């Protein structure tokens, strides 16, 4: 913690006593100062503290201002010109007079309606007051440096802070600006000499810089005076550079520095030159990442030893942050980093993201998540969870999540896989890991859900043969809801607090909102619908032997956090995937849009656009011909690595279209004839195709790269037959959107490349310049014969062990399952709820697990005397915990709302109101039980009048509590799942209207109005 003292600086006791003694002699008047001689050094003369006699007459008489100014400046000038040794008392006297002159100057400046040079300001310029004072202060003895700096800074604080005229800042004048820059440089050199150890000048210095930055944000024209647009200048932006060392200071100094830096960053968003300086020439970006690492290293490796955590603790909350200073500093640094991403220029953002990932997440956070004992892993997971909870900007969330998806440990598993493995432990580590996974699921990110769930469900190997036909409808909804309600334990029927129409209606309302949010997010941002047809599952072909022995190969897609979280102009267009995809007939023809994701491809809608034997494709002048060669093993590998695009290229190919395809390959003129081995390869490829459709899919249009002149290209395009297919307005609108998004991506990438090329030329010391801040993804292989994957298996296993797990692990497990149930994708929805689908014997069925739990709970309840009493006490206990949990959540909300940086509204899914204990809160938000009840509200005792008589029950009270809690949770969980599955059939996606569609609709409406006017 930096310390600062009074505005006059720290003084010794002796000097203070001298000031007191001299100040007591007030017989000398200001008028006598001109006639008085400079006292000898032994008995220095100190005048009384000068003051301005404020009254109505003085305030309304500018002439009196000038005379008062002249008197004070004359007194100060005599002391400045005195060649005697500068003492502390002399310094104080000089600055007392100067403070009066500055106040008079600001009175004059604020009294003028327009920017003009008044008489007092003219006197400042004529006498070069500020420059002379700065030079005099710099020449003072070293022990007086802090005092001189604090007082000089105080003068400029008045000049900058009390300037109330928006169009007239006195800093635009060189007699004011140049001494200020000299003062700032002097303060910086002093701080460097003491290695930036805390000093009493820090607060005043940073406050002045903050005031200057505020003026720069209000009037960007001032940048011409503080920012040197000459790239060869050493001190291009002194004010910004001076703030960086104070970025992570504790207390008010650090907060003032961070606020000032954010103001400059917001200005740089509109000025490319300033942004380039910040990103390349300054050390701001690495300092941001280094500060995060430093704050993280100060955190305790064992959170339990740092703070008391209860059994229900699973993540860091607002109370935890307020209770520990190092945790508060780390949280503040995360909030600042998020604010930087929010307000800064795109080039600065890319640099900050690069340094945060390579300078903080990789070297600091990643090892902590994978190494250490259980306490260390619990703390590291909670800290990582805090990072995810604290940030809201999409690109920063992507970067944090990327650590889980892209980085691997020694066993070649991703970090996310390692966290999933910890779920089934049933201890505090699994509780914290489950909480993190729940937050990840609430992000509604396609790449996260693909890694957790869908890459294991896509091959459909968890189903018995011929079961995928059930994925086409939602006929299971009503039956599933009714069945889920039958799993409510019968021992809870008598409790109106657990089972009633009112409770079910509350769940229906809450689940509708939650399912609607999930559906909208998936519809707006996700690429695939995961309905068994989109994306098209295709085996990975490496060789004939592998294809013969491994029927369920690897499904490979390009995974990218950007694909589901980063939004374009109106969110990611689901028709446009990547401009790096293979060139297809549709993409060249640009007439037929791709099929709607999840639609059944109609064979009558399209036809294969090219006939290889068509003579119209032969160029008459050179005899060259555009060929469609057979798919080679190399191109097969390319296809399997981008099978998403392969589906788009041939998804609409009908069986009748394949009859027109001639698989013969014609050699191009001037090229060697195709060898027999190539023909054999073609025959081998054809032999591996079971149907004509697969044979047609084994061709891809190539040859455009050999066309080098425009005339040949245009002649070839003229020979392309026009499409006879007509599309609806909605299809054309979607295609227009994809083209617009494509052009915008090209423009954005070109602009970013220009910025990077300009910046990196001058940044020769950066070793990571050739790396992207967040790579777009890596190939992810999806293998069959793995059931439903380790995540779903762990969750099902944890649910199955409900009667053995702790209360809070059970709450986390059911919370994660409820979040998964809100996803509308058919693969996950049918797996969880469709009883018609026959699963493989080794795959756990949700309904069977819940039926088994109900049976065990009812059997135990019927064998235990007084179970109804225990049930009521269990409800009371959970209600009290729910109220405490709501208070914690409300405290966290207040903390977020009190932050000085605005939150991103696109992350609504992360702040879901469906908390762990929300199932047990009262419907009218009041306690169901009076506070003066005989039992403590935070204890759950099973001793009743019957329990006292039965020693068997008292010896097994822990087991009884386990079953009581399980009965309560299962009753609520069944109703919640039933409400969720019912909403799957009623919720309709609400995608955003794209600007292109909105523009065309306005054009159509205006045309219709014009037609009506003409008709009238």
UniProtKB/Swiss-Prot annotation:
Transmembrane feature ranges: none
Highest taxon of source: Eukaryota
Region Disordered, residue ranges: 586-608, 757-778
Protein name as annotated: FHIP family protein Bm1_18400
Family assignment from sequence similarity: Belongs to the FHIP family.
InterPro entries: FHIP, FHIP_C, FHIP_KELAA_motif
Signal peptide coordinates: none
